[in-house]
Swiss-Prot record:
The keyword Ligase does not apply. Keywords: Ribonucleoprotein, Ribosomal protein, RNA-binding, rRNA-binding. It comes from the Bacteria. The lineage of its organism: Bacteria, Pseudomonadati, Pseudomonadota, Betaproteobacteria, Nitrosomonadales. It comes from Nitrosomonas eutropha (strain DSM 101675 / C91 / Nm57). Disulfide bonds: none annotated. Part of the 50S ribosomal subunit. Forms a cluster with proteins L3 and L19. In the 70S ribosome, L14 and L19 interact and together make contacts with the 16S rRNA in bridges B5 and B8. Belongs to the universal ribosomal protein uL14 family. This is Large ribosomal subunit protein uL14.
Length: 122
């Protein structure tokens, strides 16, 4: 469960290391975001020679949360950290590699590119 001011790790090779959620997209009163939701993020920590610089604002999709996601069969999938993949304005991933596992819930028409790049789909 991600809200404003939440810090997330970046699960791609864009050069950003840590981002902070500055807005949960999808309604004026929406407070929380989960796996598969798009948020606005500000880059807090970046690699020296990366594509993305500190202070820039991007869209991102959440791929892992410590809160987890409940499946229809009753199982609960949780992760150790909160992680996101940075997107451009067309909601396509900027990076060319994804690090760590992602969940099956991303397997929609919008995020099939992320699922295909991921090393493991849980």
């Amino acid at each position: 469960m991600i809200q404003m001011q939440s810090l997330l790790k970046v699960a791609d090779n864009t050069g950003a290391r840590t981002v902070m959620c500055i807005k949960v997209l999808g309604g004026s009163k929406r407070r929380f975001a989960g796996i598969g939701d798009v948020i606005k993020v500000a880059v807090k920590d970046a690699a020296p020679r990366g594509r993305i610089k500190k202070g820039e604002v991007y869209n991102a999709v959440i791929v892992r949360t410590a809160k987890g996601i409940r499946r229809s069969d009753g199982s609960l999938v949780k992760f150790d950290t909160n992680a996101a993949v940075i997107l451009n304005n067309k909601l396509e991933p900027i990076g060319t590699r994804i690090f760590g596992p992602v969940t099956r819930e991303l397997r929609t028409a919008k995020f099939m590119k992320i699922v295909s790049l991921a090393p493991e789909v849980i």
